[in-house]
Amino acid sequence: MIKISRLALALGLASAVSTQAFAAGLVLNDNDLRNDLAWLNDRGVIHLSLSTWPLSQEEIARALKKAKPSYSSEQVVLARIDSRLASLKADFRVSGYTSTDQPGTPQGFGQTQAADNSLSLAFNNSGDWWDVHLQGNVEGGKRISNGSDVNPNGSYGAVKFWNQWLSFGQMPQWWGPGYEGSLIRGDAMRPMTGVLMQRAEQNAPETWWLRWIGPWQYQISASQMNQYSAVPHAKIIGTRVTVSPFQSLELGGSRIMQWAGKGRPHSFGNFWDGFTGKDNVHGDDSNEPGNQLAGFDFKLKLEPTLGWPISFYGQMIGEDESGMLPSANMYLGGIEGHHGWGKSAINWYVEGHDTRSNMSRENYSYTHHIYTDGYYQQGYPLGDAMGGDGRLLAGKIELVTEDNQRWSTRLVYAKVNPKDQRINKAFPHSDTLKGVQLGWSGDVYQSIRLNTSLWYTDNDHSTADDVGASAGIEIPLSL
């Protein structure tokens, strides 16, 4: 790779961030954007937390403005991020998707499709203190039942005050450093309707005795579950906090409570009992405040200390509490790398999950004696995409060329639902899955983008086709 001049860097960087320097609003889960941001982040070009989604567009712009690229390949990625943000936040955006069937393996960050065929039209408008994203979706061959062929999934409205974004709508979330899944808050299900609050910019505290925590973010959300028959109108209340005391380390803590609903206590006192961990204080445990999950995650980057663009990450989420700490834990761990090849970028990871309790106990994770439909909405998990009691090992490598073509190969080995739990409709039968998935995406005309995928899955009981293919198109339109 060839060093580029300071003048070229300055001019190129100014061009790359010019349209985003004054951007405001939220950015929903997007795999292409995350991979490019992670490539820069893990190489020390930018500093940005990527474990809590939606992201704030102001924080992305702030990170890009402070970017320190040294190679032409890094400048290419900066420009690509700018282009992707412009596409995602275009005034109008038309998206279409079609497939032969659903993939036979669990899908990772930003990859969930709720139907075999869909057409979406989105309208975006934002200013210094507001952000509106209105989206209508028409679906056919639904994978996740919704009671209607038309829905507003992905829509939201948000206002900003004192560096805080407060939003309402149906927004997907993601809590944790994993690519294949999050043990506590993933996007494998349809988004719930609710409110969400988070910081716009993740600056470190100005108070001297808190400055050591470094850049930090929080997210507080309260949503109502859809079509949850066990306890209709059940609520999901969650909070997450991340801190970065060193450039090489990010720590996160997450907690969620499944609470209230039809026929359930919903007083502030009952909520407070749950919030303070008094889950079993009543003689009649039918008054137990709710179903809770909590835990921690981390990401350790080697670039700041060793100069290697490689990072380790992990997540631990418990179904119970013991000694003020999570217990009956599920685990996730992985390693990722981000390299340059000329002006092309290479991203890869290897990741493992175990959603059994303490890596052995079954029929416990994502279940509850009151909320008997479990930690699932419409049968699809709010946490890990394979649901409870599963084990997964997956690896993926992606090549991104200078002209923004993405070529990827993903390998998956998973054991899912060994007890045939009826609440898990994503994988309703005990099965061993061995799959390969190939992907290509590229710009076919100006900013019109085509996404394609081809997969094969070896399984015993899946109702999905062993071999399948999909295609998607994105058409951003600006006034």
Question: Where do the model's predicted regions map?
Answer:
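Gram-negative bacterial Sec-dependent N-terminal signal peptides
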Residues: 1-21
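N-terminal periplasmic/intermembrane-space "pro-region" immediately following the signal or transit peptide
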Residues: 11, 22-111
